[in-house]
C-alpha cells in the first residue's frame, strides 16, 4: 500500500506575515528574527549548527535535558560534559538536520541573528493548523534527505539503546500534547528552541521566545511545548508565562545482567494561554 507525504504543505501564520518585514525578518532591538523558507538559504547551515551544539552540550555548557537523556541514558541535568566525543557531535548534527527538515515543510524555521548577522539562536515552530508530528510517508521522506541516525557512542547502548529512548521520548511528547494541549483549537507548538553555547545567558533565548509569544498573540492562539529540567521550566514560565499542564515519566529499563539501573526522565508539557479577546467598547 502506498502513502502520501505532507512535504508539499507549507502553512503560513497570518501573524508571521504581519510581524516580519516582507514576511522575512523583524528587528528586535539588539537582534533580528528571520523566517527561513528557502532550502538554499546559507543561514540554514548556521541554524543546524546552533541547534546541534545547543542540544549536544559542550565542556562548558550543559546539554539539553531531554535529548541528553536520549543519548546518555542519564539525568544529570544542568551539568556540562566532561568530554565531547566525535560520536556525540555526529549524532546531534544528524538530529539538527532532521528537525530543520521537519520544520522547513511547515515554514517553521526561525533564526535569531546578532548585529553582525550571525545566527545565535534558532527555533522549530509548528504554526497554527499544521501537523505537529510526521504524517503519512513524511518521516521516510525526511530520512531519505538526511540519512539514518549515526550510532550513539559513549553510553548510548545502555538501557535498550538511544534509538529506543528516542522513540519513548517521541511517544511521551505525543501523549502529553494530545492530553493537555488545546488540540481542538489552532495553536503554536515550539518543537525545539536552542541557543548557541557561546551566546547563552545573553538574552538570546528570551528574545526569540518573546517574539514567538508576540506572533501567537497576533494570531490569538496559545503556545505549547514539551521540556524537561528545572532550568528549562523556569525559562518558559518566567519569560512568557508558560505553566505546567502535564507530566510524564519516560522510563528506560536497565539490563540487570549488565548492572544497569532504570533511568527515568520527567517530561513536562507547558502551555502559554491564548490572549483574552479584547472587549468591544460600550456604546453610549
Model-assigned labels for residue ranges:
Residues 1-12:
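Short acidic, low-complexity intrinsically disordered linear motifs used
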Residues 67-109:
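Active-site rim helix/loop that mediates acceptor-substrate recognition in acyltransferases
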Residues 16-49, 53, 57-58, 68, ...:
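Conserved N-terminal entry element of GNAT/NAT acetyltransferase domains
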Residues 106, 111-194, 251-263, 276-283:
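Conserved acyl-donor/pantetheine-binding loop and adjacent beta-alpha core of acyl/acetyltransferases
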Residues 192-195, 201-214:
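Conserved acetyl-CoA-binding loop-helix of GNAT-fold acetyltransferases
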Amino acid at each position: 500500500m502506498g502513502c502520501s507525504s505532507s512535504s508539499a504543505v507549507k502553512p503560513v501564520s497570518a501573524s508571521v506575515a504581519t510581524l516580519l518585514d516582507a514576511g522575512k525578518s523583524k528587528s528586535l532591538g539588539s537582534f533580528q528574527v528571520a523566517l527561513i523558507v528557502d532550502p538554499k538559504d546559507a543561514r540554514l547551515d548556521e541554524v543546524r549548527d546552533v541547534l546541534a551544539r545547543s542540544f549536544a552540550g559542550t565542556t562548558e555548557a550543559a546539554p539539553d535535558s531531554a535529548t541528553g537523556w536520549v543519548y546518555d541514558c542519564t539525568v544529570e541535568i544542568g551539568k556540562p560534559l566532561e568530554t565531547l566525543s566525535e560520536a556525540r557531535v555526529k549524532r546531534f548534527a544528524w538530529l539538527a538536520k532532521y528537525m530543520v527538515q521537519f520544520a522547513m515543510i511547515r515554514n517553521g524555521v526561525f533564526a535569531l541573528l546578532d548585529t553582525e548577522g550571525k545566527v545565535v539562536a534558532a527555533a522549530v515552530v509548528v504554526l497554527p493548523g499544521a501537523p505537529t508530528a510526521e504524517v503519512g510517508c513524511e518521516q521516510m521522506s525526511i530520512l531519505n534527505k538526511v540519512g539514518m541516525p549515526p550510532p550513539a557512542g559513549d553510553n548510548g547502548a545502555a538501557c535498550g539503546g538511544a534509538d529506543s529512548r528516542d522513540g519513548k521520548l517521541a511517544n511521551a511528547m505525543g501523549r502529553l500534547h494530545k492530553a493537555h494541549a488545546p488540540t481542538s483549537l489552532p495553536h503554536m507548538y515550539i518543537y525545539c528552541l536552542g541557543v548557541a553555547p557561546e551566546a547563552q545567558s545573553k538574552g538570546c533565548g528570551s528574545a526569540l521566545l518573546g517574539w514567538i509569544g508576540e506572533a501567537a498573540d497576533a494570531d490569538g492562539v496559545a503556545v505549547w511545548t514539551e521540556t524537561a529540567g528545572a532550568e528549562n521550566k523556569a525559562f518558559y514560565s518566567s519569560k512568557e508565562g508558560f505553566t505546567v499542564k502535564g507530566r510524564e515519566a519516560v522510563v528506560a529499563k536497565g539490563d540487570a545482567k549488565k548492572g544497569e539501573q532504570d533511568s527515568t526522565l520527567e517530561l513536562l508539557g507547558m502551555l502559554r494561554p491564548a490572549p483574552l479577546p479584547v472587549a468591544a467598547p460600550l456604546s453610549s
